[in-house]
Amino acid sequence: MIPRKLLIAIGNVSSFFLVSASPRSWSSLQQRDSCTFNSSTNPQCWGDYSLDTNYYDEVPNTGVTREYWFELQNTTAAVDGVERIVLTVNGTIPGPTIVADWGDNIVVHVTNGLQNNGTSIHFHGVRQLNTNQMDGTNSLQQCPIAPGDSFTHSFTAQQYGHSWYHSHFAVQAWNGVFGGIVINGPASAPYDVDMGVLTLSDWYHDTTDYLWATEARSGTPPSVNNGLINGTNVYNSGGKRFGTTFQAGKKYRFRLVNTAMDTQFKFMIDNHNMTVMASDFVPIVPYETDVLSIAIGQRYDIVIEANQVPSNYWMRAFPATDCSGSNESADNIRGIIRYDPSSTEDPTSSAYTYTTDCNDEPIASLVPYLSMNASTPASTQAVDIDFNTNITDTGLRKWTINGDDFQAYWDAPTLQQGLINSSYFNATSGIARLTDDNSWVYFVIENNGANAPPISHPIHLHGHDFYVLAQEGGATYSSTGTTLQLTNPPRRDTAVLPASGFLVIGFITDNPGVWPLHCHVS
């Protein structure tokens, strides 16, 4: 059972939703005049494709397969100088980065070398069009991979940008089972150097299994010991900081991912502005900011120009304290940018002013480069989030959606049960069954129940990009009074449900399967 994880699926017991519509086939690829070759100064082009290509319908057929072999292992590590039990992918935290080009086939062989636990690997934000069985959510699309067993994932890189993969087995990911994904493609802003994935994590000196057992009875999130940038940081006198070097005049692309368990971050690099050019897997019209709010599971592509006086500068990830667990290292989650690679001195730069709220980046800033409008829905689902403290005789405190908490049946995945008996979906609570092909559906997700604490939730949908139609904290949704943004609203797969407020999302039922919709706080 997964606490603090609100799962609406596209089909399983307890707070899920189901898309059982027919697929929308990729349109036949049209031959066109070749776009100028992709380069740092002309990143909008990608062979015969470009940023103007509708990537929901058209995908390059590269004929290339990128193959990876992952083994999960039990070990100990001191990523911040404090040794603890961890779980790793191929012996590292984060695990190896999956790298592919837009249109490639990706094959990942996962071997469970853990001593006592099952596992499954989910490829966060990857659309998995017509490959629902490869999504990697155990108890929904597959059984857990047993110790000593293997499972092979095979899917097409239908999007481009970056994301992360992580275990979807209980709270295993936050013991170290995660890594980056990079899918090369066009970009909406020029850059000179691709710095790859930059992960932002909170870090505990106890295992997440121990923390879960404690939190489930107390109802209070555990205190955080530290935070990591790309899997490393200092703590007291141990550990080391993440660091990299800038060359004056160059533009550097960072692919940010918030891989935290219970922390939204405010990210910045002292004295440097950021050009934000993608949110999740969606290229956007570039905008500038000096502080970036990034919720759990979200990704942003940013470009930093090395245009400051050559020196050393702090890279910082501050916890957004309005929704994040208290962190004893809140002001010390830092990396170092050096203009002189031989320098060993700590920076003396100062942080930008930032707010402690847990809001998303403004809707007005997240303008998709490829413009698409939302349409009138065939149906609207209401989803309420509540915190109930009297569920079981054991005293466990659980989060619920529409009164249901998530139940994991590892030996009876929802997808399998639905194929065996189609009436299963009608008899099981927590499922929204969406049966109309290629139709719009809206979800109104509210966070103002009588027992709901006033904190935000990062809401993640598998198998789809959704349209963010409305998002407001401290307010109640009204079908007549709430204004929806239907003209080119933000599209993404993870968005913040504001504290004591609501989030309205819309999407098209064009990807049949069993897909979870859940809060990404662990």
Describe every region a protein language model picked out.
Residues 18-147, 192-193, 220-252, 377-386, ...:
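N-terminal, post-signal-peptide metal-ligating segments of extracellular/periplasmic oxidoreductases
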Residues 115-116, 128, 139-193, 292-344, ...:
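Extracellular/periplasmic metallocenter environments
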Residues 130-142, 277-290, 331-334, 377-522:
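Active-site pocket scaffolds in enzymes
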Residues 1-28:
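Fungal secretory targeting signals
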Residues 81-83, 117-124, 255, 263-270, ...:
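Short, hydrophobic/aromatic beta-strand segments
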